Amino acid sequence: MSNGDRLIWIDLEMTGLDPEQERIIEMASIITDSQLNIVAEGPVIAIHQPDSLLEQMDEWCTRTHGASGLTQRVKESTISEAEAEQQTLEFLGKHLEPGQSPLCGNSIGQDRRFLVKYMPKLEAFFHYRNLDVSTVKELARRWRPDVLEGVKKQGSHLALDDIRDSINELRHYRDHFFKL
C-alpha cells in the first residue's frame, strides 16, 4: 500500500469557536492507512496560552477543559503555537509528502479555520479536501438513524481521544452504513 493512501487525522482543542477571538490550546495527530489502521501517533501537545485568555473562556470550555485537566496543562506548558506546528510538521513529514492526505476528523472545517489563522504551514501540508466524519454522521442521521445507535465515543474532549473516537466512528459507518 502506498504512503499516498495514508490519512492524517488532526484534532484541536480551542478556547472557543471563533478563530478571530480564540486560540488553540491542544493538538494531536494520528496517521492511518486507507483501512483506518493506525500507522503512527503524533505528539500530543498542550499549547501555552496566557491566563487572561483562559479566563475569558465560556462556561462550557471552562468546565470541560478544567475537568479534563487540559487548562492546567496549558498553564504549565512552555510550547508555543509555532513550536507545536513545527513538531507536528516534523512528525507528518516522516510519513507522508505534503499535499497527499486530506485533513481528517470530526467537524474538521472548524479545525481548518484555526489552522489557517494560527498554523498556516501545517494547514498547507494537507490536500485541499477534507474527510469529515461529521458529514457521514449527518447523512446517517437522515437516512439510517438506526446506524447511529452503535456509535460509541469517550467524549473526553482531549485531542488524542477525540481522534480515536473519530476513527472508530468512521469504522462503524464503514461496517454498518456503507455497502462495500
Swiss-Prot record:
What EC number(s) is this enzyme filed under?
A: 3.1.15.-
Recorded GO molecular functions are:
3'-5'-RNA exonuclease activity; nucleic acid binding
Q: Which residues form a coiled coil?
A: none
Top enzyme class: hydrolase
Which CDD domains does the record cross-reference, listed alphabetically?
Orn
Q: Which GO terms describe its biological process?
A: DNA metabolic process
Q: Where is the Exonuclease domain?
A: 7-170
Annotated active site residues, numbered on this chain, are 128
| Gene Ontology terms: cellular component | cytoplasm
Supply the HAMAP family for this chain: Oligoribonuclease (MF_00045)
The family this protein is said to belong to? Belongs to the oligoribonuclease family.
Query: What does this protein's UniProt record list under function?
Result: 3'-to-5' exoribonuclease specific for small oligoribonucleotides.
- What this protein is called in its record is Oligoribonuclease
Task: State the gene name recorded for this protein.
Answer: orn
